[in-house]
Regions:
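Structured, solvent-exposed acidic/aromatic patches
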Residues: 1-5, 9-321, 325, 354-356, ...
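C-terminal functional modules
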Residues: 294, 300-305, 312, 316-459
Length: 459
């Protein structure tokens, strides 16, 4: 179990930074080096396949003693862990498919053929359980608690005056496609007294239906997600009259001391928030899902790999699983069968070019990976989809922000942590040499060969 999870975590690290310490990493306590060498991403990925294959072999012997301290939904089930490991093998094979196509094909087909199987339903998803603890990303915090809901920790916002809102990048795509997930993922709240450390219902008053009705009325002017590259206060949204939002009017009358219509809280409710139902302690942490596996199988068929079934089947089955997973894991208004079927009827891969199919599959994967942002970013870079807005077409808010980099193209890696230069200086500098001497956001990692897909520059 630990070996499988180490592969998962090290994949996040190498996908984020590129070359990282791997073979010598984490061994100082046991007599190893405290200054581990950086290994190439290619060598790291090759070891992933070796590790996962060996783990599957051990687990398929049915020895549950190989799985101890399990904090996932699998409850120590060795064969469930084998399916998870095999599904990860499919993920990482697809990841290297542009840079090492023969290796990728061989590993993917090996996973498909393995008798251990792979994650094929939401009941088999790999998830972890969070503790019911406070968020630690608030004003003055020094550390992050990785045991609490990760989406909530990073995206809930620091306090009632520093919330996080949904950008037009996500909102407009869901809205334009009449996607039933839109107002399950996004909600509107009145929350001047909300907790800084917990996604609570008490002081996040949901006014979504009232706000949407107002925005779609003669008085309104449509939805107002945050502009690309902007803060929520840019391109200011005017608040409606209190009586236009009945809950607002009622709360102002009942609790005048709270200030529901003061300090712009009534204007903030016009911006969509990420639903707090995705940020609560009881929500699972997503590692690997049947939806992702089905999308991987669909894309594998487009590459001519040996996979039974059709692109259309896996594509639509993946979408269905994604919507049903939202119903299963989160306390949202359930997406109905009619809504699911209407959405499925609106999209098809039949009669579509292979590149367009790739875009369709990976757009849906992008929506799915909202719950697993590291995987979402990695898959976007690997696939090149969805097409992003060209940041150069949008304002630079220099009066509010400091720009550390004049290159506004989408980052393709993160800079190494600053402490590496202090505590592992020699190896850090060797790693920089492979980057051309500069630790920046724009040097692609080994497997990232796909050109960025962005909208054209405005004339």
């Amino acid at each position: 179990m630990l070996r499988i999870h180490r592969v998962y975590l090290m994949a996040v690290l190498t996908d984020t930074y590129g070359d990282v310490p791997y073979f010598e990493a984490g061994k100082a306590l046991y007599g190893g080096s405290a200054t581990p060498a950086y290994d190439s991403q290619e060598d790291i990925y090759n070891d992933f396949f070796k590790e996962l294959g060996e783990c599957i072999g051990i687990l398929m012997k049915g020895n549950n003693d190989a799985v101890t301290g399990d904090v996932t939904a699998y409850g120590g089930d060795a064969k469930a862990w084998a399916k998870y490991a095999n599904s990860l093998r499919m993920r990482y094979a697809m990841r290297i498919s542009d840079v090492a196509p023969e290796k990728a094909k061989a590993e993917f087909e090996k996973a498909v053929a393995d008798t251990c199987g792979y994650i094929s339903s939401n009941a088999e998803n790999a998830t972890i359980t969070y503790i019911d603890g406070p968020f630690t990303l608030y004003d003055g915090a020094r550390d992050l608690d990785f045991r609490v809901n990760a989406l909530g920790e990073m995206l809930y916002g620091q306090d009632s005056d520093s919330p996080t809102f949904v950008s037009a990048t996500l909102f407009n795509r869901l809205n334009d496609r009449k996607d039933p997930r839109l107002y399950r993922i996004c909600r509107h709240y009145l929350n001047p007294k909300r907790s800084a450390v917990k996604a609570d219902d008490a002081w996040n008053v949901d006014v979504t239906e009232e706000v949407v009705a107002y925005q779609n009325s003669d008085k309104g002017d449509g939805p107002h997600p945050c502009d690309i590259g902007a803060a929520w206060w840019h391109n200011w949204v005017n608040a409606p009259a209190n009586e236009d939002i009945p809950t607002l009017a009622r709360l102002v009358n009942m609790y005048p001391e709270v200030g529901f219509d003061q300090s712009n809280y009534n204007a903030r409710m016009m911006r969509p928030f990420l639903s707090i139902q995705l940020e609560k302690a009881e929500c699972p942490g997503i590692l690997m899902t049947s939806t992702e596996v089905k999308f991987l199988l669909a894309e594998a068929i487009t590459k001519g790999w040996n996979v039974d079934g059709s692109i259309e089947f896996y594509y639509k089955a993946g979408i269905r699983d994604a919507m049903e997973m939202l119903n299963q894991y989160y306390k949202i208004k359930a997406i109905t069968e009619e809504e699911i079927q209407d959405y499925l009827n609106s999209t098809t891969t039949e009669g579509v070019s292979p590149e367009s199919i790739k875009e369709m599959i990976n757009y849906e994967a992008w929506i799915l990976h909202l719950m697993n942002p590291a995987e979402g970013w990695a898959n976007l870079r690997r696939s090149g989809y969805p097409t992003l807005e060209n940041r150069y077409n949008y304002p630079r808010w220099t009066s509010d922000f400091t720009y550390d980099d004049d290159d506004l193209t989408t980052p393709v890696r993160l800079k190494y942590p600053n402490l590496e230069a202090k505590y592992n200086k020699a190896n850090y500098e060797k790693a920089l040499q492979k980057l051309g001497g500069t630790d920046d956001w724009h040097h692609r990692v080994w497997w990232d060969t796909e050109p960025d897909h962005v909208t054209p520059l405005n004339p």
